[in-house]
Every structure is written in C-alpha cells, then in structure tokens.
Amino acid sequence: MASAPISMLAMLFTLSGLRAQSVAQPEDQVNVAEGNPLTVKCTYSVSGNPYLFWYVQYPNRGLQFLLKYITGDNLVKGSYGFEAEFNKSQTSFHLKKPSALVSDSALYFCAVRD
C-alpha cells in the first residue's frame, strides 16, 4: 500500500490573561507519511503555572478541542489517538500520534494561559 503524505499546518495562539505569555512553533508545516509517527512541536513561555491546550481544525470544519494540560500527569491523552507530553524543564507541550492517518491532515493550534 502506497503511503500518502500528510500535511499539517501548526498555528499557535495565546489565551488572554494578565501576565506575559507566548507560544512558539519551530515548524510552520509538518509532513509525514501515513503510518509514521507524528509530532507537532509547541514551546511556551509563561510567568506562572501554565494551562496548555491543543485544538484541531479539519478541512471545512470548525475548531475542535483535542486535549489540555492543567496539572497532574505529564502525559495527556486526547481525542483521535493524539497525546501530548508536558515538559516543564524544556517548556514544551508537543502533540504526538504514534501512527498518522491521511485524515489527520488539518490545522493544529497550541494555546497557553497562566
């Protein structure tokens, strides 16, 4: 079976709050072959404790919530087989999926608030 490339455009935003906060995306687009592991990177900067979120927007559909980290276990399981790992020392919250599907082609949004 031939593998089709999966394109994902990662976009980032911050939820407004009183303190300085930001998210950064080192890659504008991620391309993986179907069946390969997928990682969409997100790093953040906050002055307090972070609340981190991932959202997805599939073609011709509205924004959908995938997962969030507020406190507790650093590995967060989300919808559609996605998970994200909170790493405080590296200030990262990378979205991962062990085996990407063509249907995963979408816009992915990382968000932070403190």
Swiss-Prot record:
InterPro entries attached to this UniProt entry: Ig-like_dom, Ig-like_dom_sf, Ig-like_fold, Ig_V-set, TCR_variable_region
GO cellular component, one term: T cell receptor complex
Subcellular location, record wording: Cell membrane
Signal peptide segment: 1-20
UniProt domain Ig-like: residue ranges: 21-114
Disulfide pattern: C42-C110
One Pfam family linked to the record: V-set
Keywords: Adaptive immunity, Cell membrane, Disulfide bond, Glycoprotein, Immunity, Immunoglobulin domain, Membrane, Receptor, Signal, T cell receptor
Sugar-bearing residue positions: N87
One GO process term, biological-process aspect: adaptive immune response
Subunit relationships: Alpha-beta TR is a heterodimer composed of an alpha and beta chain; disulfide-linked. The alpha-beta TR is associated with the transmembrane signaling CD3 coreceptor proteins to form the TR-CD3 (TcR or TCR). The assembly of alpha-beta TR heterodimers with CD3 occurs in the endoplasmic reticulum where a single alpha-beta TR heterodimer associates with one CD3D-CD3E heterodimer, one CD3G-CD3E heterodimer and one CD247 homodimer forming a stable octameric structure. CD3D-CD3E and CD3G-CD3E heterodimers preferentially associate with TR alpha and TR beta chains, respectively.
Function: V region of the variable domain of T cell receptor (TR) alpha chain that participates in the antigen recognition. Alpha-beta T cell receptors are antigen specific receptors which are essential to the immune response and are present on the cell surface of T lymphocytes. Recognize peptide-major histocompatibility (MH) (pMH) complexes that are displayed by antigen presenting cells (APC), a prerequisite for efficient T cell adaptive immunity against pathogens.
Name of the protein this chain belongs to: T cell receptor alpha variable 3
Upper lineage: Eukaryota, Metazoa, Chordata, Craniata, Vertebrata
